[in-house]
From Swiss-Prot:
Upper taxonomic lineage: Bacteria, Bacillati, Bacillota, Bacilli, Bacillales
Region (Involved in Mg(2+) ion dislocation from EF-Tu): 80-83
Compartments, as annotated in UniProt: Cytoplasm
Assigned keywords, A-Z: Cytoplasm, Elongation factor, Protein biosynthesis
GO-annotated molecular function: translation elongation factor activity
Organism: Listeria monocytogenes serovar 1/2a (strain ATCC BAA-679 / EGD-e)
Protein's name in the database: Elongation factor Ts
Amino acid sequence: MANITAQMVKELREKTGAGMMDCKKALVETEGDMEKAIDYLREKGIAKAAKKSDRVASEGMTHVISNEKHAVVLEVNAETDFVAKNDNFQQLVDALAKQILAVRPDSLEDALKTEMPNGQTVQDYITEAITKIGENISLRRFEVKEKADNSAFGEYIHMNGRIGVLTLLEGTTDTTVAKDVAMHIAAINPKYISREDVSSEEVAHEKEVLTQQALNEGKPANIVEKMVEGRLKKYLSEISLEDQPFVKNPDITVGEYVKQSGGKVVSFVRFEVGEGIEKKEDNFVEEVMSQVKK
């Protein structure tokens, strides 16, 4: 039997919003498998949805810039929100974005080795900034996109860089449309461009969960299939950009809005500061005791 810890129960509660005892039972029933426990709670109708993404817990900012042919979106992390709002930090982020746009390195490792206009490597430039600012700073990730002539980049930065989105549309040069789509992505956070992009494995998994959910609700077997079909269609439309109601005009979908310009969304990148990074949580008792001992 798997050892179910309080931390595992806490994590499952955060991901599903289910009660403590329900989470503990789910973990026991699934031998401590977190993903299976999420499915178990969903099938029982206890968890409304699986929040499988890691907690957002780091500071820093994203940035998006472009030129005639290329665009870059990147994330730079710092330890505190205070530093993230510092002018020196924001200038560093802008300088790193311009460097990556100019050099277009293939990887993060390559980016850190490139030489900036002042002769420093990117890594040395960051190290120097750490000394001046007094916090650990890191270039976490970036993506570079290239466009053809009859295309448009859309750039959108939300909440002073908390979220950065870069879109690429083909078949139109309308940057307003491209930016509107980027704004929508920042707000709604779709997983895919279209439902055709969803893997068969994900569809099969969701169908299995929805089927078990319907059966557990006591629905007759002869109508379960139709229920699952309807719920699956709704699920796919919710995670697919083109099928989502457009935030600026919910009467049409994003796909319909883009089609009016003669274009098509071919790619998008959405970075949210700290997603997938879990900040260290100090034990409250230990924190108090550490202060007492000083």
